[in-house]
Amino acid sequence: MGDHNLNVQELLNLFQNLGIPRQPNHREVIGLRMLGGWWGPGTRYILVSIFLQDDSGQPLQQPRWRPEGRPVNPLVHNTIEAPWGELRQAFEDLDVAEGTLRFGPLANGNWIPGDEYSMEFQPPLAQEIAQMQRDELEEILDITGQICAQVIDLVDMQDAQIRGLERRIQDRLGLRDNLPVAGIQAPPSSPIGQPIASSSLQPIPGSSSSPADLDGIWTPRQIDPRLSRVAYNPFLPGSSDGSGGSIPVQPSAPPAVLPSLPSLPAPVSQPIIQYVAQPPVPAPQAIPIQHIRAVTGNTPTNPRDIPMWLGRHSAAIEGVFPMTTPDLRCRVVNALIGGSLGLSLEPIHCVNWAAVVAALYVRTHGSYPIHELANVLRAVVTQEGVATGFQLGIMLSNQDYNLVWGILRPLLPGQAVVTAMQQRLDQEVNDAARITSFNGHLNDIYQLLGLNARGQSIARAQSASTSGNSASAGRGRRGQRTQQQAGRQQQQQTRRTNQGNQGQRDNNQRQSSGGNQGQRGQGGYDLRPRTYQPQRYGGGRGRRWNDNQQQQQAQPGRSSDQPRSQSQQPQPEARGDQSRTSGAGRGQQGRGNQNRNQRRADANNTRNVDTVTATTTSSSTASSGQNGSSTTPPASGSRNQGD
């Protein structure tokens, strides 16, 4: 049938007249129950959905309504009951539904005796049949025939029951002429209620005939025990024969008249055929608890963590095992929480997942006063996010949107989110619509700003995960990583050794040009960071026995006549030598050191000199240089470079 115009104001008037304390929502499905119209006095139904917004969430200038191709179920759908003319003012071009859908709950032909909607069924009249197509008419006649057949069967069954009751009444009235004694029939001539004198009753032997001359059928053993409760029973032996009865007979008293017939035994009731068979009780659906636990994990041991745990995994649980009824959701929740003491829920608490979380939260945390709601929601937002905090706040505050929004607004991640949320929420028609669409708006804004569900930056999370993956190694690669680290450390040690040797050569080269650097004064200092600290400070690399030999090989043409400036900082090797001498020896110029190095070079040509020997020689040379003048020739055995 397509879309049609909707008059929202008339729809609101219908809601108010029917006592519905709310406003219609976007995409709400409503059942219309039309009480009479152009088709006649019968009741007809149609299921419609209303549209108040477009796809972007903006209000429509002209709201629309659209018929749904489903039957109306008043027990499930929100149903509006009014005459067809009044409903047509709100829903333009309103008409009955197509086919058998116009019968509403009876669209499938299931007529239930005693049901309100079944008892008001009216078959289509001539004016309604005239508007039907051939296929539609055949379908309606089929369903109408089924309903009429069920009604006829019910009438026949009730007629049989009425005839049975009449027969029982006639049988009971026919027994009023007979006394209810087992195995005996009263003479038809004796009227009911006629007094019988006790003196006429004589003891009857077993072989004699009955008082009614019934050929000896009756015997005292056949007395019905129920007759003993009668105040005066002439068929029991009297006190005259000495046997006595249940109640002594008083001869002087007049015979009592039977006021009524004694109660008859209940007749065997005829089986009543129930036409409408009760629907079979559906077998309880098996819950795949193992599959659900594979997604959610184990239940938290702390009961206070259970509500938020269920709230986080509600979507995953619905994905594994969809739940359509509160009863089924209640069974799943109780199975997950494992019957914890005091946490078992009823179906009334499991209308949706928000109600489940709210009920469990109140049970585990207690009922909070309203002035502490801000602290509760702040803790929930910090742990679970704004969306979860909003849902819980709505439940705990009894749908107070303004209170919850005022608490959560300062907790949003940034002014951009606050502005965007306020702009979108202001476009909603009322607080109920804002509550319904809050999470949708929040997720859209988070996605637009590049934030995750908790308002955190996605780029930061990705960088953190990338660094974490690069820092961590997979299982099975630990041995390979250890080997790589060992090889890398060995290469670094080799590289440092080579750099140390190269640094020694560079130091020797700078010593050869020390005179020129001394002339520059302070400008000649080497300001690069010192790799090794002097040994007098506890540092240093130590010396090898062949370090001097390597220095001489690297600098064979160094002259000993070039003076060194006292302001020049000694090199690491020279500092190593000076640390073993006295303070006066360290104050001399570099001429003595040059002669000492030359003497060691000549000595190394003939034999290997120990480090201790070289140190002793250098110490004695430095002492002799301190006692003498600067022009004193070196000790014997030393050679000048010019020689």
Curated annotation (Swiss-Prot):
PTM characteristics:
Specific enzymatic cleavages in vivo by viral protease yield mature proteins. The protease is not cleaved off from Pol. Since cleavage efficiency is not optimal for all sites, intermediary molecules are expressed.
- Residue numbers spanned by region Nucleic acid-binding: 468-493
Q: Where is this motif: PTAP/PSAP motif?
A: 251-254
Annotated spans, Involved in viral assembly and export: 31-54
Q: Name one GO cellular component term.
A: host cell nucleus
Q: Where is this site: Cleavage?
A: R293, A294, F321, P322, N334, A335, D610, T611
Q: Which GO terms describe its molecular function?
A: DNA binding; RNA binding
Q: Which residue intervals are annotated with compositional bias (Gly residues) in the record?
A: 515-524
- Record's Pfam families? Gag_FV_central, Gag_spuma_C, Gag_spuma_N
Q: According to the UniProt record, where is the region GR-box 3?
A: 575-607
Does the keyword section mention RNA-binding?
A: yes
Q: Where is this motif: Nuclear localization signal?
A: 523-544
Q: Which GO terms describe its biological process?
A: microtubule-dependent intracellular transport of viral material towards nucleus; symbiont entry into host cell; viral budding via host ESCRT complex; viral release from host cell
Task: Give the span(s) annotated as GR-box 2.
Answer: 523-544
- Quote the biased-composition stretches of kind Low complexity, using this chain's numbering: 198-211, 461-474, 481-514, 547-572, 603-632
Region Disordered: what ranges? Answer: 180-219, 232-254, 460-643
Which InterPro entries does the protein's record reference?
Gag_C, Gag_N
The UniProt keywords, alphabetically, are:
Capsid protein, Cytoplasmic inwards viral transport, DNA-binding, Host cytoplasm, Host nucleus, Host-virus interaction, Microtubular inwards viral transport, RNA-binding, Viral budding, Viral budding via the host ESCRT complexes, Viral nucleoprotein, Viral release from host cell, Virion, Virus entry into host cell
Specify residue ranges for compositional bias: Polar residues: 633-643
Q: What does this protein do?
A: Involved in capsid formation and genome binding. Shortly after infection, interaction between incoming particle-associated Gag proteins and host dynein allows centrosomal targeting of the viral genome (associated to Gag), prior to nucleus translocation and integration into host genome.
Q: Note on file?
A: Foamy viruses are distinct from other retroviruses in many respects. Their protease is active as an uncleaved Pro-Pol protein. Mature particles do not include the usual processed retroviral structural protein (MA, CA and NC), but instead contain two large Gag proteins. Their functional nucleic acid appears to be either RNA or dsDNA (up to 20% of extracellular particles), because they probably proceed either to an early (before integration) or late reverse transcription (after assembly). Foamy viruses have the ability to retrotranspose intracellularly with high efficiency.
Q: Per the record, what about its domains?
A: Gag protein contains 3 glycine-arginine motifs (GR-boxes) necessary for RNA packaging, the first of which has nucleic acid binding properties in vitro.
**Would you tell me the protein name for this molecule?**
Gag polyprotein
Which gene name belongs to this protein? gag
